[in-house]
Amino acid sequence: MRRGRLTAAALAAGALGGACATWPMHAVPIGTAAAAECAPRDTRPGPRPEWARAKRATILVDSVLLGGVPALRTELRGWRTATVGRPAIMLPAAEAAIRSGGRVAPLAIVGVGYNSLWERGRRNYAGWAERFDDGARGLVRALRARGARQVVWVTLRDAGRGVIPSGALWQFDAYAWYFPYVNERLRRLDRIRDDLVLAEWDRVSKRTGITYDAIHLNPRGAALMARTIRAAIEAEADAQRPPPPCPPETATARS
């Protein structure tokens, strides 16, 4: 997720402002200089980041996202994708798979976290959270070391019993209690990293008819997850575009 950062440009601007304090000043009507310098084309933002323009993605899966890969490939038409992972994979094994594999694409789409260890009622939560955080950070480091420049991590489904198929309520009762714990840790990771953004499956999956059990996708759910991931990619790619040289209100047509 992109956040406010103190950039080198801002530091340079501050230093220049101090240096210019003693320069001669000339009064210019507000907007005159900007209008003279800006053309309509100058109001367009800069290009998308390289990771988005490359249109190559590595998809790291457990059984949930694995079921959505065909729909995701359809949604990402024009992208080259490779899938890594397996059902029931845990974070340490996912990191090992990345480190022992080949080059990772500039965009990594991560759909793991269902297979993690916790205790009910937040018992020993701090210790289990630290363990999860270490695993998640290690995985992101491995992805970066292998070539990823942007990570999109899919959150876990966090829905009530009322939207779960009746035959899968046992699964919901056995496992779904810790899915919010995982999402809490992923949101924390998102807050502290500029190279990671969340595809918020937990927010869009609170509905019926998208899974055949508590978590695994049916075709409708696979299509919804694919759209959710694509939306996260598009939003982050646009957010990372450099701002236009001139605000739209200062642009004037040139003959």
Spans of features found by a protein language model:
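N-terminal secretory targeting modules
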Residues: 1-58, 236-255
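Conserved SGNH/GDSL esterase-like catalytic core that processes O-acyl groups on lipids
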Residues: 37-134
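Extracytoplasmic/secreted proteins, especially bacterial periplasmic and envelope-associated proteins
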Residues: 59, 67, 71, 93, ...
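Extracytoplasmic/secreted cell-surface and envelope-processing proteins
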Residues: 67-68, 117-125, 161-166, 206-212
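Sec-exported extracytoplasmic/periplasmic mature domains
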Residues: 77, 102, 113, 141-148, ...
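Histidine-centered active-site loop/cap adjacent to the catalytic His
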Residues: 94, 210-255
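Active-site segments of SGNH/GDSL-like serine hydrolases
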Residues: 111-117, 142-176
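Substrate-gating cap/lid alpha-helix
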Residues: 160-200, 219
